Amino acid sequence: MGRLRKRFNEKGRQSGIQKMLNLKRARLHRSVREQESSSEVHANPEPDNQDSNAEILIDVPKEERQKRKQELKDQLLKENEGSISSKKKKRLDKYIENKLKKEEVASLIAKLAEERIDTSLLSSSKNLGKQATAKEKLKKSLLEEKLGLPLSDADSRLYKVVDVETTTTKSSTAETNAPEKYSTRSGFGFGFSTGTNESEITPNIKVLPPKKKKNASWGKMLNEDPEYDSAEEDYLSTDSEEFSEDSDNSSEENKDTNEPSTKDAEKTVPEDVVNLRSEQKLQPSFGHPEFENEDFDLETSEDDSSDDATERASRFKSWANKQILGADVGEKSHDVAPDNKIDNPDADMVRAQRMPRKLKMREEDVEPTADDIEIKGRKTTYTIINRPPEIQESRLALPIVAEEQRIMEQIFANDVVIICGATGSGKTTQLPQFLFEAGFSSPESENPGMIAITQPRRVAAVSIAKRVSEELTGFSSKVSYQIRFDSTINPDTAIKFMTDGILLRELSSDFLLTAYSAVIVDEAHERSVNTDILLGLLSRIVRLRREMSKSDQKVKPLKLIIMSATLRVTDFSENKLLFSVPPPIIKIDARQYPVSIHFNRTTKPDYLQDAFDKVCLIHKRLPAGSILVFLTGQQEVEQLCQMLRKRFVRSFRPLKSRARIVVSRKTMSVENEDLQSETEDIDQVPTSSSSSVTYDDESEPMYVLPLYSLLTTEDQMKVFDSSPEGHRMCIVATNVAETSITIPNIRYVVDCGKAKERVYNEKTSVQKFEVRWISKANADQRAGRAGRTGPGHCYRLYSSAVFDSSFPLHSLPEILRTPVESIVLQMKNMNIDNIANFPFPTSPGRSRLEKSLKLLSNLGAIDSEGVLTKLGEQMSLFPLSPRFSKMLIIGQQHGCLPYVIALVSALSINQLFVSKQSLLYDAHDKNSRSEETDLIDDDEIKQKEEYKNRMRGYFNAISRFQAIDPDAPALSLLSAVCAYDYASDKRKFCKENYLREKALEEVTNLRKQIIGLLKRYMVRVEKEFFKLQLKPPTSVQIKALRQFIASAYIDQVALYDKEKRGYVTLFPSGSEVVQFVPDRTYNIDSEYVVYLSLHESRSGRVYMSPLTEISPEHLARLAKNTTLLSYSKPLSYPPIRYLDNATKRECWVIPILSANIGTGSPSWNLPAVQIIQKRINGRWVNC
């Protein structure tokens, strides 16, 4: 019989019909609607048990609702006797309906409150996708078993399957012949009676192998108790199953007896042991409340109640806790062998047949010790060092010395180890000594190579090497250092400190680092580019050395130790590309005194003025101690130094003899409470502008020193000297004082919370300096400077809310902020073809790598397939930018090599001239004023006149150096370097010509280094080219130098636009036009200009630093064979001339210079040139 087929869109028609019926019903009178509704209720009575899953639910309590409504209405009418108007009746009906609704809601809530759902088997949504542990799976299975539900985990085993051959003979034999010397620990409360025949115990029992225990506390308890034998317990637990059938009745009688009789013990003990063993297997942890009251007895007896198992479990738990705590149980054991072993040999055979289970601790809970680390065949070699007592005492005060044993064990057991220790823990100076004393670098040991320690800064490498050589008394000749311009390496060197760039250079010649047995990478948390590349290479070298040592005994494994001052090591330890197995991490506590952190209530925009006010209050109110102020740049440092000197330095004003009482700061308390009370209103002090700063003759004098990277070495070393007597030292520094340098006696730190960073836009190649918030890790580093010698205080010039919301946790790695073409060239030289797959700790991104490869292709270092060319191989020999390396290689023409060396060195160092801002601060210095302004009495007028004179001399000096070629500003640097070499008094020469003496010293050192490299790799170079004092270049040499510069910067070309009155760059710069840097005057009238770099100012305008002008003909010749230059079709005139039977042709074409990056890049037509083309496979190709 067929079914009634549903019509199309039946539900839609039903809804439409229902709407029509509702509208029709709404037009009826209310009394008629009420009659119809009541008739419907009577016609369709609702059953008591209504299906809640039905599609339509009919309202059941309508009759009750009407009845209740009528009762309320009668009650209210009775209370309000008299006539009620129709309006009040309507309001009364509405009131009754609202009241009924409230009563229904209240009853519904009461019903819901009575209904409860068991949520024990429910899980939180946040744990979705998370794999449950064995303990959680067992707990869930037990609950499902208790509730009578099917087990969700099919692998869960709640019961132990035992096959027992129950024969009367074996049962009676087991009862009468129980082992005499088989006894358990006194904490169990069980004993065995003596038997006569022990050889008849041959039970036929199949026992499933138990699962491994995962309870660490149980394993620790067993390890702490030397008398406990886990195999004996397993033996007793398996024997007890033979007596399970005969022990049902006796268990009830003896459950409360700790020392039962011999007869009862024969029946009771095995059952108790089985119950306890079953409970032990089912309980994830002994103290869990959900399992303590459960009955997990696996015996077949039905008379044993859950109370017995609970009582026995509690007794076992109390014994286990007492054993863990080492307490005396109070019960004496009976018949326990002294060595806790079974004397019967037959019983030993039984035990071996039953394969007792041995309990082990989890690997993650075991802390490796010297006994746990297995080092096979290691030859022990050590070096004894006799240090003076004062050095030994200072070493013992360092936290890392206490961890020497643990550190060396991990180094011997692992090839890679990470050590985290805050600044001041002693890891940099002590770890090389640990390795040296343990036999590293000794020819007789298994690690005969040197110990290499890399530092990101040259100053740190030199200073640490000197410190380690002082501590290694008698072995000071074993410690050496090698930096860019200096080296003390000798044949006896065993510990070598160097910059990370030096080690990278050594990798290009010796990739396996066969001369080293251990490499220590220090300051890895700074994430410099060289450090990241070095770690990526070392991760592969360590693996290669380990594999090669297995087949060749001459090759020894390499040990890599990564040291970080912060806990930011997840980029190394959790990076599977670097280390497939995470290396162990050792954390060392720092020798740090407590530092109190004080935030501002509000963050003031003028942090320079706020820093001045803070320093003034600290100097006036707080006890003795040096002050360290962190600012963003040289300009702010000099300005604050000027304000503080004007306020507290007496040389600015004549001293006034005035009797006053001064409390010595040495006698003042340094307690935190006193300090808080003194600085309580520190944010409410009114600020004063720098122009209104006056000398304070009531305060003690202050010794103010600046510290930034552009200072001379002599001026930088002043911060390590002691201040004059009666003066408080105040050091105003940039972030150079944040790491590497430890300034003594710093008690107070004033932190502005900002730093000036160079931001590089990889799309536009525009650089700009931005003042940004530092990271939280850097803020902690700055605060830690105040806790080196004693309790200190750090005053942060920002609020805690800004610190929490605006400060990043860590700063970006340097590899994400700088160009990487130099690193890519070095990796190409190491035969690393696929650089994208290199194990960077933080990948720079595929786009940046492709951009660097394109630049190397334009420079001719690699071909179109990415293979290193001969020119690229020569460029990789120099520790310079690829642009400068190319200048050195092609600059051997016309005798220009000496000038190219000097020019490359000057461009590498850059900033040979002082900045215009420093001229303003020199004008305020009384010692640097000229004789012309001495006759002026007014200080402000005197400062303005002095500034004008200095600006006039500044531009005159630049004009003198540019006289060699006004169209090539880069040659002014060459002129300054050559003039410096001829100066007898170099300091006076730099001061008169507004040059930075420190920069020129670095240029001289770099020239010497480049000359040394050229002597090593280029034997054809004449000796005359290596002189430092050079004669002025000829006109031909000047033209050649300009082309050398343009060849190295062929992609950084700008064309002058007359309509826009500015230059347009070849690659988009983000600005329509760019202008010259306004620091100097340029006399360039050429159409095409090659520039050094682009800079964005605070106003958003883009400026360029020009190098030289270039003609379009030279530009077309230099851009040949690059992706920047293409040619048009042959011109019709002059006509084409065919050669060699029409296989070649000579024609004129228009060169087109473009960036070839798609839409938006300009293309410039250069003057037509004549070229020769050859026909290959039907196409004309340029020869």
Curated annotation (Swiss-Prot):
Output one GO BP term.
maturation of SSU-rRNA from tricistronic rRNA transcript (SSU-rRNA, 5.8S rRNA, LSU-rRNA)
Q: Which GO terms describe its molecular function?
A: ATP binding; ATP hydrolysis activity; helicase activity; RNA binding; RNA helicase activity
Question: Where does this protein hold ATP?
Answer: 421-428
Q: Where is this region: Disordered?
A: 1-92, 165-315, 673-696
Write down the Pfam families for this protein, in alphabetical order: DEAD, HA2_C, HA2_N, Helicase_C, OB_NTP_bind
| Gene3D superfamilies attached to this UniProt entry | 1.20.120.1080, P-loop containing nucleotide triphosphate hydrolases (3.40.50.300)
- Please state what class of enzyme this protein is: hydrolase
Q: Disulfide connectivity? A: none
The protein, known as: Putative ATP-dependent RNA helicase PB1A10.06c
User: Which organism is this protein's natural source?
Assistant: Schizosaccharomyces pombe (strain 972 / ATCC 24843) (Fission yeast)
Organism lineage:
Eukaryota, Fungi, Dikarya, Ascomycota, Taphrinomycotina
